[in-house]
Amino acid sequence: TSKSQFIGVLDIAGFEIFDTNSFEQLCINYTNEKLQQFFNHHMFMLEQQEYAREMIQWDYMNFGLDLQPTIHLIESTSPIGILAALDEECIMPRASDDTFTEKLTSTWSPPKSGPDAASSKFLPSRQVRRFIVRHYAANVEYSTDNWLDKNRDPLNDHVARVLATSAQPFISVSYTH
């Protein structure tokens, strides 16, 4: 019999880095970060725990990719993360893309030196209305131009009606008003 050797590579969500990265790229890269964290946890951490339970001999592998700090930066509510800060700015009377960027910078900028400086997932940019996120794949500089307007865009009525008819109670309840 002939043996077939195969290595498959799946690009889960397609990390995006362009010359100018905006809200859409943050959403895509955030999704990719979450999926990669899920994959790492389930394929590596849980699998090694299963080996230990079954007393299978193996060499422990530290994959060293805990993506939670970056995920926390994006989705945290305390301290306020990128998405929560964006939602908050959208309801403020005199909010702008500038005030949004300033809020992120004042909340997340690392100290100039020390251990937190090197491990911070947020970096201020030298350019106006921009910030940098240290994703696992690369550092990405995001332009916050028009983020408040993009976040205020209403959900399409047809999409909301379709989601309201979902067989999954969590989804249908979320879109029934």
Where are these regions (language model features)?
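Extended, low-complexity interaction tracts enriched in P/G/S/Q
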Residues: T1, G8-Y175
